[in-house]
Amino acid sequence: MGSRIAAPGQREEKLCLLILLAGAALKLCYAIQVPYSASPHDLGGPSDWVTYSGGHLSYIQYLYQLRQLWQGDKMWGMFYHPPLFHMLGALVFGLFYKSGGSIQAVFEWIQIFNTLAACAIVFVGWRILKHLEVKGRKLVTLTAFLSFGPTLYWLGTALTNDCLMTLLQAMTIEQIILWAKKPQMGVIIKAALLLALAMLTKTSAVLIAPAIGCVFLYVFLKTIQEKGKISPLLWQFAAFLLISVPLGCSYVLRNWHLFQMPLNYVAPGWGVNDPQYIGDCTLFRRLGLPSLKQLFSARIHWDAPKKYCNIWWQTFLTMALDEGILVLRNLAQKTAAVLLVWSCAGSTLALLAGTVRTFFSRRTDAAVRLLLGVGYGVVFLSYVVFAFRYPRVCTMNTRYIYITMIFLVAGYGLREGEMPRAVRALLWGNSLLSTALYFLCAV
């Protein structure tokens, strides 16, 4: 009798593992097909070993060649970014580059490394769902949505620090969930190290810190109320701060000291002369309804950037297709790509509605609700502010905030009741359509 009761859970576990493996295999197949420059966000060109363009590619080569952090007289290009991703890229260079050999071939290997990080994001997302005791068809559907959804196909092939940052953020969130269940020094030290490493990958990883702080405060007050003891928690909080703050902030503090670089520095655009400039678009166009061209586009048409100034739809477009990287050869494929963008919008809104419901449900642990709700809110609000501070088309991209999808999937997983059929069909439709397009239209 006991084995028959356990069987459904075991079947779900096996099915989820198959989904994870299939998703990883498909991502690797996609990465093998496309060049490392398929998603060319701030890549720059490869270095000639004498001069450096300041893009992500030459940053990696600089670290490999000189084995030191940037020592120029000022910060420029991508060198203001913390170096962890680029250091790992330099290590891959050391493994695969031979003097006089193909630099491009080594960048392809780095692309594979980045794709493995994308696969790991899905695995950590599944583990978070398991920690939150999400079960049944809901667990399978959400796992499939993470595994086969479109964003991680292209994000894994983009040679930027966004994918690794998202992985380390997700791992931090997992540890905070475990700590909230049972506060232990070992768990909080892991969380501190992971957050610090995320910040050493990209400074904006710190945006999940307010949510972590809310969890700490809630558990602290709850412990005082229930047990009247606070000293063990104070030691744990001290350990978290002493590890995460000095290590995570070390690179930006170095640059502030050496180059007087602001702690929140971002490489500036060209102002109103930037061909992507959209700062003169109205507030309604930015935050209201998207243009018809944007609604029915499967890529950004750079000759008309102001048609793509709407933050919401630009986020959905890049979630599905980055800036339009698929090779769409006929009307059927173009129509399917537009439908994928629409399904990303519908899926995100459905997950958001479920997460909001979870946030206001007293049946879910308050610490988890704070982590997911505050985490999503702070990251997304910061993204909107960023899009206005730097009004360019390229600043509205899901790559900056993919961690919000982990918050939404976890939040929906905790939603009371079964997943409605319409939502399940929407998520599965998105997963299957994205997989078909990224398999058929990669090159």
Identify the role of each PLM range.
Residues 1-34, 220-221, 232-243, 356, ...:
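Start-transfer (signal-anchor) and selected internal transmembrane alpha helices
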Residues 29-80, 84, 94-96:
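Extracytosolic helix-loop segments that constitute the early lumenal/periplasmic catalytic or substrate-binding loops
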Residues 132-133, 172-190, 198, 220-223:
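Membrane-interface transmembrane helices that cradle and orient dolichyl/undecaprenyl
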Residues 175-181, 208-245:
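Perimembrane helix-loop-helix junctions
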Residues 124-127, 164-181, 193-195, 407-411:
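Specific aromatic-rich, kink-prone transmembrane helix
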Residues 151-165:
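Short acidic/glycine- and proline-prone juxtamembrane loop motifs at membrane-interface regions
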Residues 101-107, 122-148, 166-167:
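Transmembrane-helix signature of polytopic, membrane-embedded enzymes
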Residues 235-350:
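Membrane-lumen/periplasm interface segments of specific transmembrane helices
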